[in-house]
Structures are given as C-alpha cells and as structure tokens.
A protein has these predicted regions:
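CN hydrolase (nitrilase-like) catalytic-core segments centered on the catalytic cysteine
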Residues: 133-150, 240-332
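Active-site catalytic loop in hydrolytic enzyme cores
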Residues: 136, 140, 155-250, 267-275, ...
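N-terminal secretory signal peptides that target proteins for export/translocation
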Residues: 1-10
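Bacterial N-terminal signal peptides
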Residues: 15-24
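Cys-nucleophile CN-hydrolase/nitrilase-fold catalytic domain and related Cys-dependent amidase chemistry
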Residues: 66-189, 267-276
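Active-site-proximal beta-strand elements of phosphoester/diester hydrolases
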Residues: 36-54, 198-201, 229-239, 256
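Short hydrophobic alpha-helix segments
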Residues: 80, 197-199, 320-324
Length: 347
C-alpha cells in the first residue's frame, strides 16, 4: 500500500528531474511554428588594434556578439564586407602606421624582412591560415552563443594547379595569379560551429582587381540559405547595383547587402546607396532588406556608410530604420515581419 502511494510522488519527482536535465540542453534556435527571424546588423568600425593578433580580433568580435545578444537576443548576427579580410595581417599589423598608403605599407614590410612581392601573393600565401582562423573565430562564437553569424568577407585563396613554366608568365603579378586565385568571400556559420554557406563577390572594384588581383564569383552560386523558415539571400557591396539577382533572389524573405563604401559619405554617396538595395528590393519584390556597412580605416583606406533596414512597398521601398552615424560602430536590430508584405503569389 505504501508503495502504491509513493508511485505518483516518484513519477512527479522524475518529471521534475527530467525537466531540469533538458533545461540545460541547447534549445532550438528557431521553432517550427514560424517564429519571426531576429537579425542584428553590426556596423563594424575597423581599428588597427583589432588586427594586431588573433586574440585581439577574437576579443573584439566576442564583445560585439555578446552585446548584440544582451540587447536584442538575435537569431542572426551580420558583419559587413571586409570585416575578416585584414586577419591576414595579424603578424605585421603593428608595423603599419595608419597614415601610410598601401604601397608604402608594402615597402615597410619588405624593409622589415617580410617576403612580399605584391598584395595578391601576400594574401594568397596567407589564405589557408586565414581561413582556419576565421572558422575558429566565427564558428567558435556561433557555437558558444548558439546563433547564426555572417562573419563579413575575407580574401579566400584557391589553388589553380602547378605552373609548368612560370617564365612564360608576363611579370610577377601574372605568375602569382597563375598559381592561385583570390576571391572576396562571405561565410555564414551555424550554431553548431560549422561554416554552412559561402558566396563570392561578382562585380569587383578597381581596388580589388588592380591592387589585389581578385577574381569574380558566379551569380549562379548565390542561392542563399534557409534559417528556420526564413530564406536569406546576399549580395556583396558593388554586386547590389546589378540586376543579375532580381529573378534569382525573388521569393526570398530577406535580402542582406554586405557593404564597404570606400568613399566619403556625402550627398552623391547617399544617391549611390539609393540605387543599390532599394532598387533591388523594388525589382525583386523581396519583402525586406538590410544594408550593413563597414566604417573606420586601415592604412590610408577608409570606409563610411549608414546601415539600414528596408521594407518593400510598391514603387519605392521604405527605410524603416537606419544607423545614427556613418563613421562609427553601431548595432542595428530588426525582427522580420512574420508574414510577407504582399501575397506570396505576387512575388
């Protein structure tokens, strides 16, 4: 009789223990019930000291991710173009004064004993090490905080194969390019810590083609990815001015533009921004868009721009939120609308 009376109590106690056990397990990032995706855009301010060592960059990134989670509890955190690109310089950043030009920086490194013929060769030879570092930083943070992270872009190196007769190459630059390719690549990390998506910039700038000898990606490799029930698609800076993605991205739920505007943010630049993602949103009818900007400077390079969130409206997408500044770091947050701004069949 005593045993029979103790069974309900035992079952209740077991239920409590099971509940406590499962409360310590990682919870699903998004439910299956159509939870609106929460996104924080990091208007990242470049500082030379961030790239002085892997530990310094990791600490800076960790602080920003923690701040985003503390203030907004996002599912997805997005960093802009070039955020990870200068991680290739962690061994030499302290030797480079912020006021010198890129060309002067190369000479300083040569004088200090660094073997560097040109920027393409330097970033290509650092490519494997940089990719591993990026995966460790962003993959580690995504797993640590159980979020999705777009770690900006970096210069991705791919081997082309052995050059049989490098003497036939016309100069050092051509020889370097014949050995391997560099791409401006974005990478997305999931809460498991793995890289789950990547995409290369297609329409390169003069800086990227002439100084870095980057090669373009392909629009057909820009499919985006699902996060929960939300299809997220991307373009990288200058790509957003071109209509290649209007049909390709149609049907997505949110379009994210990773931008590094290397010019003063003045009236003309504002008009340029208006010809980028707002036009793509209007043409593709993607219901929501995000532009996330790099700001700050490194060597004689500088970047300015205002990050913003857009919502589709016939004829002219509406800016629903934008950063307060164009030259300082900020966090900008939005919760995507749970339902499209118009019937799905109209897209």
């Amino acid at each position: 009789l005593k045993r029979e009376k103790s069974l309900p109590l035992l079952r209740a106690w077991n239920a409590v223990l099971i509940g406590i056990f499962f409360s310590f397990l990682p919870q699903p990032l998004l439910s299956d019930s159509g939870t609106p995706l929460r996104i924080t855009a990091v208007q990242f301010q470049v500082r030379r000291e961030y790239y002085s060592s892997p530990a310094a960059f990791t600490a800076a990134a960790d602080e920003l991710v923690r701040k985003a989670i503390r203030e907004f509890d996002p599912h997805l955190i997005v960093f802009p173009e070039y955020t990870s690109a200068f991680l290739s310089l962690t061994d030499v950043a302290d030797q480079l004064d912020e006021s010198v030009s890129v060309e002067e920086g190369i000479e300083i490194l040569r004088d200090s004993g660094v073997s560097i013929k040109n920027l393409h060769q330097f970033f290509y030879e650092k490519g494997g090490e940089t990719a591993r570092l990026i995966d460790a930083v962003w993959g580690g943070l995504a797993e640590k905080y159980q979020v999705y992270i777009v770690g900006g872009t970096y210069f991705h190196a791919e081997e082309k194969g052995t050059v049989k007769n490098s003497a036939e190459a016309a100069g050092e630059e051509a020889a370097a390019r014949s050995r391997g390719s560099l791409y401006n690549r974005l990478a997305v990390y999931g809460p498991g810590g793995d890289r789950i998506y990547e995409q290369d910039k297609v329409y390169l700038t003069e800086f990227e083609t002439e100084l870095l000898s980057l090669e373009p990606g392909k629009p057909e490799q820009s499919s985006g990815l699902p996060i929960g029930e939300t299809r997220v698609v991307f373009t990288i800076c200058r790509d957003t001015f071109f209509d290649d993605w209007d049909i390709r991205h149609r049907g997505a739920d949110v379009w994210i533009d990773l931008k590094a505007n290397g010019a003063e943010y003045n009236g003309e630049t504002r008009k340029s921004f208006a010809r980028a993602l707002p036009v793509r949103i209007a043409e593709s009818k993607v219901p929501q868009g995000i532009t996330v900007c790099l700001v700050g400077g490194f060597l004689d390079l500088f970047w300015e721009g205002r990050s913003s969130f857009l919502r589709y409206a016939p004829g002219n997408p509406k800016v629903v939120r934008k950063s307060r500044t164009w030259d300082r770091g900020e966090l900008l947050h939005i919760t995507l609308e749970a339902s499209p701004c118009f019937p799905l069949e109209d897209r």
